Curated annotation (Swiss-Prot):
Amino acid composition bias (Basic and acidic residues), ranges on this chain: 317-338, 345-354, 372-381
Biased composition (Basic residues): 355-364, 408-420
Pfam hit, one: DUF3654
Protein name stated in the entry: UPF0329 protein ECU03_0090
Superkingdom: Eukaryota
Listed Acidic residues bias regions: 382-394
Stretch forming the signal peptide: none
InterPro entries to which the protein is assigned, alphabetical: DUF3654, UPF0329
Stated family: Belongs to the UPF0329 family.
Region of interest: Disordered: 317-420
Length: 614
């Protein structure tokens, strides 16, 4: 039942009626049963907004990617023979669930008040299908040499096979809805009857639409495009990293709610089928659709004219950048080829000169030849030294001037890791709530003014995580964080680094992202201007928060406090007084303690290593 709860709340579109207040109350109670957390009024308003935005009927699409704990054990393009031997048994368990899971993605809808009759009907149609069900495991394992099918091929075949059940399901759904219209209780008020009949009429019409060839072909085509787009995403390292991180964080979220699950099913995500197909038909480019899917999935958005346009611009910008890089590489190769040719000609001329000299001297080594040889060796030595000095100059230029080679070597050994300055707006959160409030009320950021001390204290918990800088400065940072695409705002180049984190307080755990916002200052240094933990339910419920992977931010006026940057070198709170850092192979944990009683743990933040792709 927990998986149905997850499907109903987290990953599917919902059919909801005008009884949105009751729906919020109903769903809120179910969430509170699954989590040790009660909803306050603000969270109920956020849930109400989320339900209104996601209301409607439609089928979902599968994300063709299989996780096992913190590893991707089967990617969109993985063939059975490519799977790690130790993971094959686990993957087979997941694949065995594929026909039912894909059927659920097509057939399941949420009906306000009582969806058990839809669930029962869905299960009945699946179990009593007149044709033989697909043996997905046998199909996936069937291979001749390297000709085994990919995971996306298996998903598409199974999906198309399941479509054969839609006629029967659609007919039964329409019939059941019509019967329930006739059975509407006479004890209901006229307004309640009207709402109930309207909801059931929508379900009836939806069931009838599932019987049409056009609707069935649309469903199949959308899943095929989704699979092709995921394969395209997987080919690019930068796209794959953000896609895997978002998928991994959602799996962690589901695992926390449904901890009793034996296997982790691939994600089902609602994406507008018609919008997806129209975007592909218009541009005939799987690259553009892949960019669109990546944006919609990682930024928790929807397909719209704006998102499609962003995807088109993103692909064109990338293609232009790749074209420029290609031209630059060709130019460098041509220059290198020319240098090599000139060097060969110079060496040939040398040999000819030596040969002529030997003939004139009759094979004797005269003082002139010795002098010429010494001059040649000196010239070669000078060329090598000039080359080395040039390398040192280029190396040192980035850190403020050339130095001797010996000193440069020491400098390089000392500067292993990453160097970041920290903006005043980040350091502010290390202060007391009263001082933070005073600074925010006087500051230029409108959204932070006039906050109560209670609000400041809550925000301090997720913003005062300066210890993360220890990880950011280390050589291990790239194992934990993904860098997003760069963008320009207010004349500065900005980007983000995003990691997966778990925030724990009072026995409650929250899965989310550790966000690091950076910009390039005038001295070409990297400055951290934003640092926080953002829970996934904050992104999902839309509490005025942007996606971690979203392009852009709402931070203005970085010049304020830019003169008070710190490189944070040597920064640590007194050990045992405020926090303790625990470093492990796959996790970086910060434990915050009560300054008055260090045996009391107030909260903790664990940054997890990026999901491993096997």
């Amino acid at each position: 039942m927990r998986m149905w709860l997850v499907s109903a709340i987290a990953l599917v579109d919902i059919l909801c009626t005008s009884k949105i207040e009751e729906l919020v109350e109903n769903m809120g109670k179910k969430i509170e049963e699954a989590l040790p957390h009660e909803f306050d009024s603000a969270e109920k308003e956020a849930l109400k907004k989320h339900l209104k935005e996601t209301a409607g009927l439609g089928t979902r699409l599968m994300v063709p990617c299989i996780f096992h704990e913190d590893r991707v054990v089967a990617s969109p393009t993985t063939r059975y023979q490519d799977i790690d031997e130790e993971e094959k048994g686990y993957v087979e368990k997941v694949i065995a669930l594929l026909p039912r899971l894909l059927w659920r993605s097509v057939a399941y809808i949420y009906v306000f008040g009582n969806d058990s009759w839809v669930v029962n009907l869905m299960e009945e149609v699946f179990e009593t299908a007149p044709f033989k069900k697909s043996d997905a495991v046998a199909l996936y394992k069937r291979a001749r040499g390297r000709l085994g099918i990919r995971l996306i091929d298996l998903v598409n075949r199974t999906f198309r096979h399941n479509i054969g059940m839609l006629n029967r399901f659609g007919q039964r759904l329409a019939q059941e809805a019509e019967a329930k219209i006739q059975e509407i209780s006479s004890s209901l008020s006229d307004e309640e009857k009207r709402k109930e009949e309207k909801m059931l009429q929508i379900i009836k019409e939806y069931g009838e639409s599932l019987c049409t060839k056009e609707k069935q072909e649309e469903i199949i085509r959308a899943q095929e495009i989704m699979c092709d787009a995921c394969a395209c995403i997987w080919e690019r390292d930068s796209n794959r990293e953000s896609f895997v991180m978002e998928t991994y964080s959602r799996h962690l979220y589901l695992r926390m709610i449904g901890s009793s699950m034996d296997v982790e099913e691939p994600l089902l995500s609602y994406i507008d089928h018609r919008g997806l197909i129209d975007a592909y038909e218009k541009y005939k480019s799987i690259d553009i659709v892949a960019e669109l899917i990546k944006q919609v999935f990682t930024e928790r958005g929807c397909i719209s004219d704006e998102s499609v346009n962003d995807a088109v611009c993103g692909v064109r910008e990338r293609e232009e950048a790749e074209k420029m890089r290609g031209e630059e590489e060709r130019r460098k190769k041509e220059e290198e080829s020319l240098r090599n040719t000139l060097e060969l000609l110079r060496m040939e001329e040398k040999e000819k000169s030596k040969s002529r000299g030997k003939k004139k001297k009759g094979g004797k080594k005269g003082s002139g030849e010795v002098t010429a040889k010494m001059e040649e060796e000196k010239k070669d030595s000078e060329e090598v030294e000039e080359s080395a000095e040039a390398e040192v100059s280029l190396e040192e230029m980035a850190v403020g001037g050339a130095r001797s080679k010996e000193r440069s070597s020491k400098k390089k050994s000392r500067s292993k890791g990453h160097r970041y300055k920290v903006h005043k707006r980040v350091l502010r959160w290390t202060k007391s709530a009263e001082r933070i409030k005073a600074e925010l009320d006087e500051g230029s950021e409108e959204k932070w003014r006039n906050k109560s001390i209670e609000e400041i204290e809550e925000q301090k918990k997720v913003h005062d995580i300066i210890e993360v800088c220890v990880l950011l400065r280390s050589l291990d940072a790239n194992r934990f964080f993904v860098s997003t695409n760069r963008y320009m705002k207010d004349g500065t180049e900005r980007w983000k680094m995003v990691g997966v984190g778990i925030f724990e307080e009072g026995g409650e755990k929250k899965v989310g992202k550790v966000e690091v916002g950076l910009y390039r200052d005038k001295g070409e240094g990297s400055v951290i201007y934003h640092l926080m933990f953002k829970a996934m339910d904050t992104e999902k419920a839309g509490k005025g928060a942007r996606s971690s992977f979203g392009k852009g931010d709402d931070v203005e006026g970085l010049e304020e406090g830019a003169g008070e940057l710190s490189d944070m070198s040597g920064f640590e709170y007194p050990k045992g007084v405020r926090s303790e850092i625990v470093k492990g192979g796959d996790a970086f944990k910060i434990v915050y303690r009560n300054p008055k009683d260090t045996s009391e743990v107030l909260r903790s933040l664990t940054v997890l290593q990026k999901a491993e792709v096997l």
